């Protein structure tokens, strides 16, 4: 899993840098080119017999989606490797919580909320459940603004409700 997570985007080295770092919206043709990176990465690491097949599959499938609308093969549900499903969630969380040349980073709670809102569409329900227990957007001691407008300090997190600290 760790090696697959490290290598999942290796195909991006074959995409022109100006396309990867483009500040404005991508054209349809540019997006098609970006969508080639999983297959390019898979083809590259597939040449190495010392790299395990599960790592290669992660590189190929990390943009597949539960609803079948992902790429490069439009796989659906259980046809997607479990490790690729895990890396997919981590990849999206990382993308959302990192500054990009075209947008500012989201806070951890907004990124987690996005992932949870896309269960059974983009992401596997069971894996999101585990992920949401590992990623704590409001750890102990975090200063938060309540819906009432009051300021509070998080004293405890709720395992089943990560977006509702106490």
Q: What positions do the PLM features span?
A:
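Histidine- and acidic-residue-rich, metal-dependent catalytic cores
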Residues: 1-166
């Amino acid at each position: 899993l760790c090696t697959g997570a490290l290598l999942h985007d290796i195909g991006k080295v074959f995409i022109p840098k100006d396309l990867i770092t483009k500040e404005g919206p991508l054209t349809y043709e540019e997006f098609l080119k970006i969508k080639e990176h999983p297959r390019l990465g898979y083809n590259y690491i597939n040449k190495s017999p010392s790299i395990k097949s599960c790592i290669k599959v992660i590189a190929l499938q990390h943009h597949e989606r539960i609803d079948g609308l992902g790429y490069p093969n439009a796989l659906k549900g259980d046809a997607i490797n479990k490790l690729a499903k895990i890396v997919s969630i981590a990849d999206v969380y990382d993308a959302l919580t990192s500054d990009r040349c075209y947008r500012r980073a989201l806070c951890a709670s907004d990124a987690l909320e996005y992932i949870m809102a896309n269960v059974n569409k983009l992401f596997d329900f069971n894996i999101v459940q585990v992920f949401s227990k590992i990623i704590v957007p409001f750890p102990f001691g975090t200063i938060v603004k309540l819906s009432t407008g009051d300021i509070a300090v998080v004293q405890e997190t709720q395992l089943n409700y990560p977006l509702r600290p106490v």
